[in-house]
Amino acid sequence: MLSRSRCASRAFSRSLSAFQKGNCPLVRRSLPGISLCQGPGYPDSRKTVINSSNIFSVRFFRTTAVCKDDVITVKTPAFAESVTEGDVRWEKAVGDTVAEDEVVCEIETDKTSVQVPSPANGVIEALLVPDGGKVEGGTPLFTLRKTGAAPAKAKPAAAPAAAAPKAEPTVSAVPPPPAAPIPTQMPPVPSPSQPLTSKPVSAVKPTAAPPRAEAGAGVGLRSEHREKMNRMRQRIAQRLKEAQNTCAMLTTFNEIDMSNIQEMRARHKDAFLKKHNLKLGFMSAFVKASAFALQEQPVVNAVIDDATKEVVYRDYIDISVAVATPRGLVVPVIRNVETMNYADIERTISELGEKARKNELAIEDMDGGTFTISNGGVFGSLFGTPIINPPQSAILGMHAIVDRPVVIGGKVEVRPMMYVALTYDHRLIDGREAVTFLRKIKAAVEDPRVLLLDL
């Protein structure tokens, strides 16, 4: 009896183990009872029987799919205070498998684009917002069925080995026909029926070439198509029109001799790169010179509050640097420039430029700014009048460096020259202050020692 109990325990343990694995089918017999210890060593009169009504009838039951799967709803992240809504552009579709932190959609706002990643590995079950739809912060975007580890990408199947060329059946060589005997006499030449007459060359009419097919008159395409303005372009258009309608914009010009700054850059760029791992450019010189001039002329760093009719003077200097991207012009901000040196400025410009190229600029990177620098010279612009970036009161426009003849000490010399333009709000800034400000920038760029000596 004891041996039969042990046999029943072992059989039941095996059945329970097969059930727990979840991948093995459990099949119920069609008999009224199941004998666990039935065999040739045990008499049928003393069988240990478990009633079939107490055994689960389960076929291909998988516990992992039921216990581990979980559906979550992903919502729109919170926007900055100045942004209320955005447009959705989907990168994935229903049924796509995504890995954790993989971008599922992109929300384009007035100032930048916000990427929404997947919070976990899983499969997208539903898209709750249509492509191009408007969403606010906290709006449900899509549902995701979580799974285990992200499925490994299938390796490309190896190209099947080239099949060996089938051996063509050998065709028995047919003996060539016997060669004809070589003639020993020339055959007679038949005489022409009519005698040949010679004609002068002038009498021979050239054969007319076939007429060329006249090319049809070129018809230019007169089609047109429309594209919806993205949110960033709409915002740029709105802000620039507001600036034009609000500010009394006036532009003053000057020119800068770039000889000294070019010489300084050529002399120290290698040492600068070795120490700071950064390239020394011209933008850092203009940013530093602008901060120096803004401290001398604080009204250029101020702004009019139209609501209260007050002038707001900023004691800090945050300079916006215009960067062109495929989506439009963005202006990330370099903050507290008055406390920076050339290396700090170059490092910040490099980081912001890299984020702009990768479309990773956040709203915080572009908020604020007390003065803007726009460098149209990188595109070859020789002369231009930039538009103020509200809520600021002035903007500096840099242009291309061109060798031009100039008079130096009573002699004509060829120097690398750059035109610079300062557009300012004439409601707040007078002409004298604007010209003085621009001359300060000119002096600091032409002779960087001015910054060291605080002249």
From Swiss-Prot:
Any one cellular-component term (Gene Ontology): mitochondrion
Region (Disordered): 155-220
Localisation per UniProt entry: Mitochondrion matrix; Nucleus
Protein name: Dihydrolipoyllysine-residue succinyltransferase component of 2-oxoglutarate dehydrogenase complex, mitochondrial
Cofactor(s) the protein needs: (R)-lipoate
EC number of the protein: 2.3.1.61
Enzyme class: transferase
Gene: DLST
Sites bearing Phosphoserine, chain numbering: S82
Keyword Acetylation: yes
Keywords: Acetylation, Acyltransferase, Lipoyl, Mitochondrion, Nucleus, Phosphoprotein, Transferase, Transit peptide, Tricarboxylic acid cycle
